[in-house]
């Protein structure tokens, strides 16, 4: 059997055919890695510099923001003697948001009171308590003051102030049911209360105060039926309980009464809303601060007259400043 393929003898392979028999030649090529260390270092340096610049601008912005807000926020720390026990207290006034915050005690005995003058709400919370309390507050209508005497209260810093209680002082008792819709409350009050149920507080007058109020109404009733010849600009109406450390002051039908010492103008003709004084926000005639304590109690559901309708009272104390200083702080003039 003959083979169709032709065989080439080895001896007939010439030099020109050697290149077809030798293995292919490889050229040495230097290949640079895709991620060069120099390039990575440059990228890292750019990232670090950019981050440092951002941090620098952030720090500068935060500094100026803090510096701007610091001009409108005032803090003072003091001590208060309550029933012979010394407790720390602090007061913070936020002029921008019309907020006033008082803290008394520490730990399980801490009480926090936030006065939201913009919305007319006061929030009170006790440490370890299961409820948060709110009550109606006067909306601060800051009057226009031409010249204000700048009163320094540096003496209040670190001072020990006695907290005096009156037997017949006003008592605040929580209602039976919590607030269902809290959308009307400000973010500061909601932050204070957190997840606790919120209860309205209603004023409760002891028997002695109720008797005095009835006598005031009875005595003032004849004066409303006849008009005297020389009548002052403001007629006295039913009495309203004043601040805890001062005697009762009758409420006024008109905003100013020259016969009422709490409405007398001070040295530089500075006038204030009388409700600021009546609600215990500040003291019109005072030249120095004083303490004001209020009792927050739980309803008992018993007979209405005192003391059968409340229980479990706790105290929340604060410092009442002179109205001239208080208004000046809110206006940012001190």
Swiss-Prot record:
<keyword id="KW-1015">Disulfide bond</keyword>
<feature type="disulfide bond">
    <location>
        <begin position="283"/>
        <end position="323"/>
    </location>
</feature>
<dbReference type="GO" id="GO:0001886">
    <property type="term" value="P:endothelial cell morphogenesis"/>
</dbReference>
<keyword id="KW-0165">Cleavage on pair of basic residues</keyword>
<feature type="disulfide bond">
    <location>
        <begin position="282"/>
        <end position="286"/>
    </location>
</feature>
<keyword id="KW-0272">Extracellular matrix</keyword>
<dbReference type="GO" id="GO:0016020">
    <property type="term" value="C:membrane"/>
</dbReference>
<dbReference type="GO" id="GO:0016525">
    <property type="term" value="P:negative regulation of angiogenesis"/>
</dbReference>
<comment type="similarity">
    <text>Belongs to the chondromodulin-1 family.</text>
</comment>
<keyword id="KW-0472">Membrane</keyword>
<feature type="propeptide">
    <location>
        <begin position="211"/>
        <end position="214"/>
    </location>
</feature>
<feature type="transmembrane region" description="Helical">
    <location>
        <begin position="46"/>
        <end position="66"/>
    </location>
</feature>
<dbReference type="GO" id="GO:0051216">
    <property type="term" value="P:cartilage development"/>
</dbReference>
<dbReference type="InterPro" id="IPR007084">
    <property type="entry name" value="BRICHOS_dom"/>
</dbReference>
<keyword id="KW-0325">Glycoprotein</keyword>
<feature type="disulfide bond">
    <location>
        <begin position="293"/>
        <end position="317"/>
    </location>
</feature>
<keyword id="KW-1133">Transmembrane helix</keyword>
<feature type="disulfide bond">
    <location>
        <begin position="297"/>
        <end position="313"/>
    </location>
</feature>
<dbReference type="GO" id="GO:0030948">
    <property type="term" value="P:negative regulation of vascular endothelial growth factor receptor signaling pathway"/>
</dbReference>
<dbReference type="Pfam" id="PF04089">
    <property type="entry name" value="BRICHOS"/>
</dbReference>
<dbReference type="GO" id="GO:0001937">
    <property type="term" value="P:negative regulation of endothelial cell proliferation"/>
</dbReference>
<keyword id="KW-0221">Differentiation</keyword>
<feature type="disulfide bond">
    <location>
        <begin position="132"/>
        <end position="193"/>
    </location>
</feature>
<keyword id="KW-0891">Chondrogenesis</keyword>
<keyword id="KW-0217">Developmental protein</keyword>
<keyword id="KW-0812">Transmembrane</keyword>
<comment type="function">
    <text>Bifunctional growth regulator that stimulates the growth of cultured chondrocytes in the presence of basic fibroblast growth factor (FGF) but inhibits the growth of cultured vascular endothelial cells. May contribute to the rapid growth of cartilage and vascular invasion prior to the replacement of cartilage by bone during endochondral bone development. Inhibits in vitro tube formation and mobilization of endothelial cells. Plays a role as antiangiogenic factor in cardiac valves to suppress neovascularization.</text>
</comment>
<dbReference type="GO" id="GO:0005576">
    <property type="term" value="C:extracellular region"/>
</dbReference>
<feature type="glycosylation site" description="N-linked (GlcNAc...) asparagine">
    <location>
        <position position="243"/>
    </location>
</feature>
<keyword id="KW-0964">Secreted</keyword>
<feature type="domain" description="BRICHOS">
    <location>
        <begin position="105"/>
        <end position="201"/>
    </location>
</feature>
<protein>
    <recommendedName>
        <fullName>Leukocyte cell-derived chemotaxin 1</fullName>
    </recommendedName>
</protein>
<dbReference type="GO" id="GO:0012505">
    <property type="term" value="C:endomembrane system"/>
</dbReference>
<dbReference type="InterPro" id="IPR043405">
    <property type="entry name" value="Chondromodulin/Tenomodulin"/>
</dbReference>
<feature type="region of interest" description="Disordered">
    <location>
        <begin position="212"/>
        <end position="270"/>
    </location>
</feature>
């Amino acid at each position: 059997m003959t083979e169709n393929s032709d065989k080439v003898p080895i001896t007939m392979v010439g030099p020109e055919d050697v290149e077809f028999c030798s293995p292919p030649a490889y050229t040495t090529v230097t290949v640079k890695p895709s991620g060069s260390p120099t390039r990575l270092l440059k990228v890292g340096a750019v990232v670090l510099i950019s981050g440092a610049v951002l941090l620098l601008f952030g720090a500068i912005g935060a500094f100026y923001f803090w510096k701007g807000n610091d001009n409108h926020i005032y803090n003072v720390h003091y001590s208060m003697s309550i029933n012979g026990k010394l407790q720390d207290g602090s007061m913070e006034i936020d002029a921008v948001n019309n907020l006033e915050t008082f803290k008394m005690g520490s730990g399980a005995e801490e009480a926090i009171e936030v006065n939201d003058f913009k919305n007319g709400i006061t929030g009170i919370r006790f440490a370890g308590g299961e409820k948060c309390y709110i009550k109606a507050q006067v909306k601060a209508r800051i009057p226009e003051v031409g010249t204000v005497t700048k009163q320094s209260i540096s003496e209040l810093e670190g001072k020990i102030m006695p907290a005096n209680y009156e037997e017949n002082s006003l008592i605040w008792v929580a209602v039976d049911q919590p607030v269902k819709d809290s959308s009307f409350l400000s973010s500061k009050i909601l932050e204070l209360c957190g997840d606790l149920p919120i209860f309205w507080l209603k004023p409760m007058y002891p028997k002695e105060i109720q008797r005095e109020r009835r006598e005031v109404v009875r005595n003032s009733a004849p004066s409303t039926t006849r008009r005297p010849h020389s009548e002052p600009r403001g007629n006295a109406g039913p009495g309203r309980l004043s601040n805890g450390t001062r005697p009762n002051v009758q409420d006024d039908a008109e905003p100013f009464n020259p016969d009422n010492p709490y409405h007398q103008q001070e040295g530089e003709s500075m006038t204030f809303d009388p409700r600021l004084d009546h609600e215990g926000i500040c003291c019109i005639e005072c030249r120095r601060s004083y303490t004001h304590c209020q009792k927050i109690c739980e309803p008992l559901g018993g007979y209405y007259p005192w003391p059968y309708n409340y229980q479990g009272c706790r105290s929340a104390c604060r410092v009442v400043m002179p109205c001239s200083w208080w208004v000046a702080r809110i206006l940012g003039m001190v």
